Design a protein with these regions (language model features):
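Short, flexible, mixed-charge glycine/proline-rich loop motifs
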Residues: 61-68, 78-83
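Compositionally biased, charge-rich low-complexity tracts
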Residues: 114-115
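Long, charged N-terminal interaction/targeting segments
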Residues: 1-58
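Short functional micro-motifs and their immediate structural scaffolds
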Residues: 81, 94-98
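Solvent-exposed beta-strand sheet faces enriched in polar/charged residues
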Residues: 29-32, 63-65, 108
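Cys/His-enriched microdomains
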Residues: 71, 87, 105
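C-terminal binding/interaction regions
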Residues: 111
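Short cysteine-rich clusters marking metal-coordination/redox-active sites
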Residues: 73-76, 89-92
């Protein structure tokens, strides 16, 4: 389950940013996760509940923005919503495509509490 290591990385980012801001805790954190990022949301949620205990994220609201995947055909340039990493272009039927959006996993923002 690589989701646990992802959550541990998010905790580290939150702790570093909280220290920089001279804050005590995080009120909310917003993540951006692409539909083709490879992250299993149920596993992320399970890992999240365990990993945030005793950290600055323990009482934080978790907001997740899902990003739909978009592919661009290398043959005809057509852009389309992708449901898998290897999907044919609906315009020319080529399988030579690039995923241009939807593989990301980012910490977009966090709000901190200075007591």
């Amino acid at each position: 389950m690589h989701e646990l290591s992802i959550v541990m990385g998010i905790v580290e980012i939150a702790e570093n940013e909280t220290t920089k801001a001279a804050a005590d805790s995080v009120n909310s954190i917003t993540l951006e996760i692409g539909t083709l990022s490879g992250i299993v949301m149920e596993a992320l949620d399970f890992a999240w509940q365990s990993a945030i205990k005793g950290t600055v994220l323990e009482k934080a609201e978790l907001v997740i923005k899902h990003v739909k995947a978009v592919a661009r055909c290398k043959e005809c340039g057509h852009e389309f919503e992708a449901e898998t990493l290897y999907q044919e272009c609906p315009s020319c039927k080529s399988y030579f495509t690039d995923i241009i959006k939807g593989k990301e996993m980012k910490v977009l923002s966090l709000t901190v509490d200075k007591e």
